[in-house]
Amino acid sequence: MDSFNNLIVVTLALGGVATGNGFNVLHHLAGNSPWFSGPEVTGISSEVPAECTVDMAAFISRHGSRYADNGAYREWANLSSRIHAANFTVQDRALDFLPSWKPVMEYPEQQIAQLSTTGYKELYDMGATYRLQYPDLYAYNTNFTLWSNYYYPSSRVRDSARLFARGYLGPNATELGSIFALNASNPRSFMNSLGSSDLCPAYDDDEGGHHHETWKHIFLPPIQARLNKLIHGDFQFTGDEVYIIPYLCGFETQIMGSSSPWCSIFTEEEILQYEYAQDLRYWYGNGLGTQIEKYMMLPVLDGLVQRFVDGPEATYTTSDTSTFVPPKLIAAFTNDGQISQLAAAIGVFDEETPLPATEISKNRLFKASNFVTMRGTIGFERLHCASEKAGNGTYLRIRLNDVVYPVAKCQSGPGKSCPLAEYQGLVKSKLNSAGNFSQICNVKDPAIPAGQNSATFFTDIALPFQTLVKP
């Protein structure tokens, strides 16, 4: 599997991206990194434990690599305008490109916020990889159902599901595949979509708030001063412009398919400081450092775990009384905010110490770069272990960008997996702690159903707020 997942890294790890000591800038940009298979930080083998089999699997993934959105492109264009209006020279070869730099998007009106060519590749590869990794979970040339957030601002999430389906199903994907795109803004979808926070008025992702800003004010000024000493004339970087340099590195590299010159500007230490800023952004924006934001994907997790508890052969009666047999591989696509919310819910970071805002927490397990990348993926495997040695029973294990992470408070099973029934209990306990979602969200809209605390869309494909999309 690693050969598939590392192909894009090999393609992109060109001059200025991977250094002589093996440090790869693209592995430290959090949500601005193209896909890569995560580092082995837990010491747990990704191989299926002896005498166990995977009889069900699931993943919830961010969309693939994309072009800049409107806000980011405006920042790029404004920076380019300032550069070209100035008269200056540079004193470092790493900045030689600067006087002539312009944004790499050739057709911004059409490309804004859409998947890039690297995104296409990531998703096709992902489909083929999952087909090879779990050959027993799909019968050749049969129908396959998957899900996506509809996400009205852009088609990139739906397109990610479409491209995955083509890689997974092959030439007959359009005939065999059915993608149910969930409209997270429809009141009837409250806590029953892949964008649960959309209908929560109290939800407020402040992008890390004062923790994020405190760290930016510590680490950015020295970088700004260092760079501006290398520029002579009437151009100087602002602090905000310095902060988007790693963003430009990640985006330009995957858009062009070759190393961006922006990747050579920050030192290794400075990149790690930027990476920590991104950790603060997610931890305190919509992760475990928040009050209600961390709960938003719990209903989806609860519905997914119930599907695992019901087992691979379960059938369901949908809301229109038809019968639905879900796939043994549950595939779903959404956005980075939901990946961060889900990471807060799954239990692998529950014993992490809150991240300080004034210094880097060097021994932290939580690194957004390892799972909120483009095509960042939180995966689940249901392990059926048939022998006493393997611990007779059914277990669950979690994989972030391929790497197995143990549940902090439940790792008694083979390969530090968690007994499935115990994991369901843990999720139910989290739901109880969260309370009534209508109340914590301060819902006032009478069209929003009360008491909806668990997602049903994985087992009901007749819901009124979903749209069928074909690959």
Regions found by a protein language model. Name each.
Residues 1-22:
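Fungal secretory targeting signals
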